[in-house]
UniProtKB/Swiss-Prot annotation:
Subunit record text: Homodimer.
EC number: 1.5.1.5, 3.5.4.9
Keyword Transcription carried by entry: no
Record's protein name: Bifunctional protein FolD
One GO CC annotation: cytosol
Domain of life according to the entry: Bacteria
Length: 281
């Protein structure tokens, strides 16, 4: 059986570092504060917000909420973002998805203040990532790096295959790995003969959003498998990789739940503390 790369010890290490930084800022009279912006009603978005609130409250980060009805105009939304940019007591801003069609069409995320963009979704932060400059990294891709670093799995010179090309995971993750001198192949729904790529990977990262998509016939001996998928099947959280099928064939594998997901919220907190430093400078 392959070694299971549990996310919990990674999260605990990061949490310890985060708490130390929070105490430092509080000793300077600064209370790290995240503003969560929600438009309309969505049960999944609200559940996500509450999970952040619960963890952040536990470690000493202040949370503010701004809720708006789905009729809010793009002009008014832009004004709100400007107010949050100018509010020195707010260090980070997180906009929950989904947004109403008008806001999505109007690229509302681009009104986020760049130095408070704790999810790294603005064009400026994504551009900085592209050229390898200091920026806020999207949380899930950074969580993958934190896990690889913790378990001392090098990526330099490695053949890494990323299955999935979303702007929130696949694309930024491929750039982060490229910046670490990995050799990257990005596969997606239009890739022909996908199995030829997945079986040859030294490190296979799956973020395609399809439960149990990768089975034993798609992996090779001795691989590192990172499952970024979060899908609900019969009321249970499952990954994009069929864990039970694959675990005995590969060298390392992350579980779902208990893998990347538990690290992601800690990365969000790390990004907020990075924003505190920028805002308070």
């Amino acid at each position: 059986m392959g070694v299971i790369l549990e996310g919990k010890p990674v999260a605990e290490k990061l949490e310890k570092e985060i708490k130390e930084k929070i105490q430092f800022y509080k000793s300077q009279g600064v209370i790290p504060t995240l503003c969560i912006v929600k438009v309309g009603k969505n049960a999944e978005a609200e559940a996500y917000a509450k999970s952040i609130e619960k963890f952040f409250s536990k470690i000493g980060i202040n949370i503010e909420r701004k809720n708006f009805n789905e009729e809010i105009s793009l002009v008014d939304f832009k004004k709100i973002m400007k107010e949050l940019e100018e509010d020195s007591a707010i260090h980070g801003v997180l906009i929950l998805r989904p947004l109403p069609e008008e806001l999505e069409r109007g690229k509302a995320f681009q009104f986020l203040p760049t130095k408070k963009d704790v999810e790294g979704v603005t064009y400026e932060n994504l551009g900085r990532l592209l050229v390898g400059e200091d920026s806020f990294h999207p949380c899930t891709p950074q969580a993958v790096l934190e896990l690889l670093d913790f378990y001392q799995i090098p990526v330099e010179g490695k053949n890494v295959v990323v299955v999935g090309r979303s702007i929130s995971v696949g694309k930024p993750l491929s750039l982060l790995l490229l910046n670490r001198n990995a050799t990257i192949t990005v596969c997606h729904s239009k890739t022909k003969n996908l199995v030829e790529f997945t079986k040859k990977a030294e490190i296979l990262i799956v973020a395609i959003g399809k439960p149990y998509f990768v089975g034993k016939d798609m992996v090779g001996e001795g691989q590192v498998i990172i499952d970024v998928g979060t899908n609900v099947v019969d009321g249970k959280l499952v990954g994009d990789v069929n864990f039970e099928e694959v675990k005995d064939k590969v060298e390392y594998i992350t579980p779902v739940p208990g893998g990347i997901g538990v690290i992601t919220t800690r990365v969000l907190a790390m990004n907020l503390l990075k924003a505190v430093k920028k805002v308070e400078a």
